[in-house]
Curated annotation (Swiss-Prot):
Keywords: Leucine-rich repeat, Phosphoprotein, Repeat. Transmembrane segments: none annotated. Gene3D superfamilies: Ribonuclease Inhibitor. LRR repeats lie at residues 23-44, 51-72, 75-96, 98-120, 121-141, 145-167. The gene is Lrrc20. It comes from Mus musculus (Mouse). InterPro entries: LRR_dom_sf (IPR032675), LRR_domain-containing (IPR050216). This is Leucine-rich repeat-containing protein 20. The modification Phosphoserine is found at residue 175.
Amino acid sequence: MLRKMGEAVARVARKVNETVESGSDTLDLADCKLVSFPICIYKVLRNVSDQIHLITLANNELKSLTSKFMTTFNQLRELRLEGNYLFRLPNEVSSLQHLRAIDLSRNQFQDFPEQLTTLPALETINLEENEIVDVPVEKLAAMPALRVINLRLNPLSADVRVIAPPLIKFDMLMSPEDTRAPPP
């Protein structure tokens, strides 16, 4: 077990070093078995955090992200968090004013993360395969850049299915009503 942990730590260190040394705008920490974002990464990336435009933390074991993560990487254009255990986002997600795409699919959201509706550049939201019942349709309709929101495989209420289509100017992807039964 210790050997596997050591290998995981070494993999994270290698990926972070590659980002710093290459001057890449991408930090890919997918499939690293992370339960939280490593604090030491803030220090290592302090001189290049403004240059990072894409972070992938997909398929880890994250339950939350800190406000420090959001404010440190406030130049992000894309954030990939699919396949974790997230159920909410910190309020500081509103500092991601340049964010164009966020993937929160296959997490544990029961409530739509309404902070996303304050992001002026956000074009794509993927919340597929969560537990979301209700969606702030009016707030989404007011988002200037939004083009697609994926809500497939969520137990959406009938109200969302009926009210949303006439109000929105973007593509709202939903599963057929009988794909998943709502929770009891």
